[in-house]
């Protein structure tokens, strides 16, 4: 599995490449988009995109190791580094950029705080308390079950497709 910082750098690269806009140093957007990437990977392939645990902060899910990503460790992703990430990893991050890249960090945070995994990490935490608990991977898996997977090639949600009962076509 890649380091989460590599995935974060690629996510910023993908955002800037696909939107033509600068990502800036919006840590809230980065953190929530990585949460959605983890959830998306669980929905699509059934395994986590990366190791590491999110904490349930007041603002939403946070990976502590990326808390000062832009201030301390941000290295812009170089296209030559593509081979460090699998096609699956790039695909998942690109999907998240297409689905959520248009939104501001606070809106994404609001979406993430509606997730069962975040709510379960803060069951009795008063809003002013900043003692975060971990988001359980099992809870993120439950959130992933609610994700509708969209096929951009066929412009349809996969759950709307009729089951294919034929054989594989030969060229």
Predicted feature residues:
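Domain-edge interaction signal
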Residues: 1-171
């Amino acid at each position: 599995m890649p380091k989460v910082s590599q995935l974060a750098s690629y996510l910023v690269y993908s955002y800037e490449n696909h939107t033509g806009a600068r990502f800036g140093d919006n840590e809230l957007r980065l953190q929530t988009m990585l949460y959605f990437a983890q959830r998306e990977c669980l929905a699509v392939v059934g395994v986590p995109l990366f190791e590491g645990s999110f904490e349930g902060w007041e603002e939403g899910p946070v990976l502590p190791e990326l808390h000062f990503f832009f201030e301390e460790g941000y290295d812009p992703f170089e296209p030559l580094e593509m081979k460090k990430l699998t096609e699956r990893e790039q695909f998942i991050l690109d999907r998240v950029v297409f689905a959520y890249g248009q939104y501001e960090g606070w809106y994404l945070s609001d979406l993430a705080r509606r997730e069962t995994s975040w709510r379960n990490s803060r069951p009795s935490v008063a809003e002013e308390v900043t003692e975060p608990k971990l988001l359980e991977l099992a809870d993120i898996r439950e959130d992933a079950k609610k994700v509708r997977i969209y096929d951009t090639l066929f412009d349809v949600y996969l759950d709307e497709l009729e089951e294919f009962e034929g054989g594989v076509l030969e060229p």
